[in-house]
Structures are given as structure tokens and as C-alpha cells.
A protein has these predicted regions:
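N-terminal leader/auxiliary helical segments
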Residues: 2-104, 115-307
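Alpha-helical transmembrane segments of multi-pass membrane proteins, especially transporters
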Residues: 107-108
């Protein structure tokens, strides 16, 4: 890729996040690599065949952990071919015809497991929590978590962008549907995202965001969400199809839709002076519990629509 084209693609990324807000990455690249790297330290807990596989192909696994986010414009595909679904994860695994591709496919499944927590719990709750501001949307809360990712993880992201994963890409290209962009264009944009992490300005922006906001994301808060995501990764890898996390939705569609409606209702009540912040805090605590319970029991999310 020429230097000019790379700069052009990097320049497109902020615009694309505005044009396709629904494609905002649930956990960002940094968090997914952090979670995947953690799982590679827990191999002794996995079934023997996965211990052997991931020990031999750790980089392919990590590439799989971020490859589900290659596609931009996901909502423009048929729901049966949405890349953030267990259906597609199974198809990727079925298409893996050698060990390196299988490691990538298991990384893809780990990505989906982590996103069940991000899209079904973390982001929906934060959207409701900041009901009295109009600016803090989906992408904002994903960026907030990225601000706490260690420098070593960003270095890993840049290293992966320079690896040759063409075999894995051919597998993914054969399974993942094109959107408004071809797989090749999506991949170039994605590589630009990984290289973007080298820019000090990007990391400085994330750090400044955390220091100046009135909406804290405390260490205890982060641990709650990320520990749950680690549990989802590990349990799905151990139990596979028997894992209760397979009932959770990686897109979080139902939870996000309900959260949007509740956020609007809370905002209207607050603006009309019919809801104090103390009353809202009490209600939000109950709603947070319902979201968490609904991860593995999606039908219980129906309670949110009548909250």
C-alpha cells in the first residue's frame, strides 16, 4: 500500500465511525487483544487439543480475536450472514482446514464471546447511565475502555498488522459476506486502524478523554466488565457448544434497543423535573442487574421494555 493511500485510509476512519455508528467496535482492538493475550496465559485450563493448538499458533489465535471487526457496514448484510453471530462463528470454524486457520477460528469465537458482554451489558448500561447528556453514545464508551489498555498491547497490534495472515484472510473471505465494501477494502481499512494505534495523538486523545470527563470509569467498574468478558472467553473455549454464553447475543441487539428507549424515557422525565438523580440511580441499579442476568437468559431482557 502506498504512503498516500495509507494516509487516505487513516483519514477515513473517523468519518466511517460517524457514518456507520452501529459498526462501532464493541470492545476495541486493544481490549480484544488484551483479553486474547490473557487467555493464552490460561491454556492449562483448556481441553488438551486446544492447549496444543493455541501453543503452536498464538498469533493466528490473536488475529482471530480481532478479525471479526474487519467488516464495516455490518448492518447492510442479511441478518443470517451478520459476522457478529454464533452462526457465522461456527461457519468460520467449519471452514478452517488446517491448524493455523483453526486457531484463527477459535480466536473469532473468543471475539464473539467477549462482545456478548460489551454489547449486552457494558454499553447498554452506560448508555442508560448517561441519560442526561445527548453526546455520549456507543463509540464513546468503547473508546473509554481503550484508554486503559497497556502500551504492550498496542505494540502487539502494530506487530500483527505486519504479519502475513493471507491464509486466514482467504478463509474469512470465503465465509464473511461483503457489505458496501469488499473484504479487501475492509481489510485495508482495518490494517490502517491497527497502524493508527502508533500515533501518539490517538493515545493522548484517549487518555485526555478519561481525565476530563464527568463520567468516571473506575478500576472497580472496569474490572466488573472485563472479568465477566474473561469468564465468557474461558467458559466458551472450555465448554464450546455447551457453554451458557452461546445463548448470549454478540450484537446485543435486544439490550441496546431497550437501553436506547429507556435512556430516552429517563431523559424526558429528568427534563420535565419528574425524576431526581437519586431516583434515577436507584432505578439504574435495578436495570443493570437485569442486563447482566439477561446475558445468558435473553428472554429476561423483556423486563427492560416494561421498566
Amino acid at each position: 500500500m502506498t504512503k498516500y493511500r495509507r494516509k487516505s485510509l487513516i483519514g477515513l476512519l473517523p468519518l466511517l465511525s460517524l457514518v456507520f455508528p452501529a459498526d462501532a467496535w464493541a470492545w476495541g482492538v486493544g481490549v480484544h487483544l488484551q483479553l486474547g493475550s490473557w487467555l493464552l496465559t490460561q491454556l492449562q485450563l483448556l481441553p488438551p487439543h486446544l492447549q496444543t493448538l493455541l501453543s503452536a499458533y498464538p498469533h493466528d489465535y490473536l488475529y482471530g480475536c480481532i478479525s471479526a471487526d474487519i467488516t464495516i457496514g455490518k448492518k447492510y448484510t442479511h441478518y443470517l450472514r451478520h459476522c457478529h453471530s454464533w452462526r457465522m462463528g461456527r461457519q468460520v470454524l467449519a471452514a478452517a482446514d488446517d491448524d493455523s486457520r483453526r486457531a484463527c477460528a477459535y480466536g473469532y469465537l473468543s471475539h464473539l464471546a467477549a462482545d456478548t458482554v460489551a454489547h449486552g451489558y457494558y454499553v447498554p448500561y452506560k448508555l442508560m447511565r448517561c441519560y442526561n447528556t445527548a453526546l455520549l453514545q456507543h463509540a464513546y464508551w468503547e473508546m473509554r475502555v481503550e484508554a486503559y489498555v497497556d502500551q504492550e498491547v498496542w505494540d502487539l497490534a502494530r506487530a500483527l498488522a505486519r504479519f502475513d495472515f493471507s491464509d486466514n484472510d482467504r478463509m474469512l473471505r470465503g465465509v464473511i459476506a461483503d457489505t458496501i465494501f469488499s473484504f479487501g477494502t475492509n481489510k485495508r481499512l482495518f490494517n490502517s486502524l491497527l497502524l493508527l494505534n502508533r500515533l501518539k495523538r490517538w493515545q493522548s486523545t484517549l487518555a485526555a478523554l478519561s481525565k476530563t470527563t464527568r463520567w468516571p470509569l473506575t478500576e472497580v467498574d472496569r474490572r466488573d466488565y472485563l472479568d465477566l468478558a474473561r469468564d465468557a472467553l474461558l467458559n466458551q473455549m472450555i465448554e464450546q457448544e455447551k457453554s451458557p454464553w452461546m445463548a448470549a447475543d454478540p450484537t446485543g441487539e435486544r439490550a441496546l434497543t431497550a437501553a436506547g428507549k429507556i435512556r430516552h424515557n429517563l431523559q424526558m422525565l429528568w427534563l420535565d423535573g419528574k425524576l431526581s438523580e437519586a431516583e434515577a440511580d436507584q432505578l439504574l441499579l435495578q436495570l443493570k442487574g437485569t442486563l447482566r442476568d439477561g446475558l445468558q437468559h435473553p428472554d429476561r431482557l423483556l423486563q427492560l421494555t416494561v421498566a
